[in-house]
């Protein structure tokens, strides 16, 4: 079979930098098991600047919402724990934190909030953290920062994003 070239690569200044995926991630790849996203596949897809279908984002939010609405307001944490704070839309910083801090499958994480605003990838941060939280309910703790309120997000760039 003859190899087919990608017509979208012809106009790229840096030919070795692949373009983002043209289509949103397939539902079956995101949710291979009912109500449990494949967080690793999502991480890979978002790292390539891939998109999700609006219906999949809503499904992810609803599953996440059902988990966090039952969590206590005050949490007691046993060490060891990896603490991550103030990501502010820096998705690639989150990836580095996960690399340095340890695999969420066997590392307890405490995220201190301020996931959104300032950076350009706030939505990607929320999507990935929600999918990790859904998979590891008892070892991923997400606190709400001051940027996770309507007043702050209306003044910064998350509303536009």
Question: Which residues does each predicted region cover?
Answer:
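Feature recognizes metal-dependent phosphohydrolase scaffolds
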Residues: 1-161
């Amino acid at each position: 079979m003859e190899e087919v070239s990608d017509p979208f690569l012809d106009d790229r200044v840096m030919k070795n930098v692949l373009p983002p995926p043209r289509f949103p991630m397939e539902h079956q790849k995101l949710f291979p098991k009912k109500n449990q996203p494949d967080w690793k596949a999502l991480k890979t897809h978002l790292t390539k600047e891939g998109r999700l279908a609006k219906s999949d984002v809503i499904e992810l939010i609803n599953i996440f919402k059902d988990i966090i609405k039952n969590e206590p307001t005050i949490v007691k944490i046993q060490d060891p724990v990896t603490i991550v704070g103030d990501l502010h839309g820096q998705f690639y910083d989150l990836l580095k934190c996960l690399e340095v801090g340890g695999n969420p499958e066997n590392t307890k994480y405490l995220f201190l909030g301020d996931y959104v605003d300032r950076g350009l990838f706030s939505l990607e941060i929320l999507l990935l953290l929600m999918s990790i939280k859904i998979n590891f309910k008892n070892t991923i703790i997400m606190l709400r920062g001051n940027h996770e309120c309507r007043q702050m997000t209306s003044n910064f760039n998350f509303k536009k994003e």
